[in-house]
Regions:
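Alpha-helical linker/edge segments of TPR/alpha-solenoid repeat scaffolds
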Residues: 44-54, 133, 137-139, 143, ...
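Residue signature of alpha-solenoid helical repeat architecture, marking inter-repeat boundaries
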Residues: 34, 38-41, 81, 122, ...
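Amphipathic alpha-helical segments of tetratricopeptide repeats
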Residues: 22-32, 68-75, 79, 108-117, ...
Length: 245
């Protein structure tokens, strides 16, 4: 049989990685299918721990490497929950680094395949809103609108978590404002404001109040074309850091 690996302390992470990788090699060489499956499952969690540690330390490159290994192992092990976590974190890390195509790939995989498996409404809201930002940056405003509207419809029917819907309303209002559709912008920012007020989150409420004021001013005086608050990415980053993964 393949060797077993039982690290005794957190400091033994490197040894655990080496041991589980060796365990996988032995199992693979001898076609021990049950041991291979167990090794992949163990590596899934070990790689996840390494990636999360690197992300916390601020080493984006090392974190992405760890999450990539974690994702590969999770897919081989059939662990949909950890695979979803890896897609979400990789998407957010790429987004933070400005790598929109990579962020789009991982966040779309999370939204389409992983959100249901993970069952984390906060992460689901952040992923939808961040993916919409990626689509907007690539010029696909229509795709961004469709994504956000579908998310709001789903969230409104199935969730009491409202930070995600608040950010989605903010994103939709921003898109409509940029397109010159002042009435729709006001409608979305009013909804954003109502949700923000119910949440009692001062940072989100300040953004909602400012954006609604700008949109109403634009509706009354079309020549008043001020920009709405541009700190949505920061709000997304702030909220993502609180996603319960």
């Amino acid at each position: 049989p393949a060797p077993t690996c039982v690290p005794r302390r957190e400091q033994d992470v490197d040894a655990a990685v080496s041991c589980h990788e060796q365990r996988l090699k032995v199992a693979s060489d001898h076609m021990l299918n049950d041991d291979m499956a167990a090794a992949y499952e163990s590596l899934t969690h070990v790689y996840l721990g390494v990636a999360e540690k690197e992300e916390k330390a601020g080493d984006v490159t090392a974190a992405l490497t760890g999450f990539s290994k974690c994702l590969s192992a999770a897919e081989r092990a059939g662990n949909a929950v950890v695979a979803a976590k890896a897609h979400f974190r990789m998407g957010m890390l790429h987004f933070g680094a400005g790598r929109m195509p990579d962020a789009t790939f991982h966040l779309r995989r999370f939204v389409e395949d992983g959100a249901a498996a993970l069952g984390d409404r906060v992460a689901e809201g952040v992923a939808h809103t961040t993916l919409a930002q990626c689509l907007r940056s690539s010029g696909d405003a229509a795709g961004s609108i469709a994504l956000l509207e579908a998310y709001l419809d789903s969230a409104g029917r199935s969730s009491t978590e409202q930070h995600g819907p608040a950010m989605a309303c903010c994103s939709l209002g921003t898109i409509y404002h940029e397109q010159g559709d002042a009435q729709r912008a006001v409608t979305m920012f009013e909804r954003f404001f109502e949700i923000a007020r119910a949440l009692g989150d001062r940072r989100v409420l300040d953004t909602a109040r400012f954006n609604l004021g700008v949109a109403r001013g634009t509706l009354r005086m079309p020549a008043y074309a001020a920009a709405v608050a541009g700190d949505l990415p920061k709000l997304l980053e702030w909220k993502a850091s609180r996603a319960g993964l």
